[in-house]
Amino acid sequence: MSAHVQVTREIAAPADILWQMVADVPRMGEWSPENESAQWLGGATEARPGATFRGTNRNGSKRWSSVGTIVEADPGRSLAFRVKAAGMNVAEWSYRFEPTAQGCVVTESWTDRRNPVLKVLSRRVTGVADRATHNREGMAQTLERLAAAAEQQATPSA
């Protein structure tokens, strides 16, 4: 059975702003405590189904990269991508945006798609023994940082 983690946070910013921020994949390192950088691949310049990107991640002295493929991109509503490393399935990530009177509820989800061999190898490569707990903590930090940036952007200056 694959692990699934979901973290939800209400953010005082419109869904369209939040979606644009998350869909700007090269900016993910601004919010995520693990992602260092991301670059679009194959001429892609925006999040649309089929677009691919390379993400570089870090945990302490450990560094690794993987390739993500956008599988869902519905502006203002949802974004999802599947991640592979060395051609093997790693995970599926998704973001859901639900407008509220105060802004938007954002739900970030992660589903582990690694096979047993890749789970063992990834512990060595990433230094993370409990990926679900590690991701839950990182996702909470990601949404906190996303909220701070989005709320600042959504608040008109005096």
Model-flagged regions — what are they?
Residues 8-12, 39, 69, 82, ...:
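Generic structural detector for well-ordered beta-strands
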Residues 83-141, 146:
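Beta-strand/loop substructures that line and gate deep hydrophobic ligand-binding cavities in soluble
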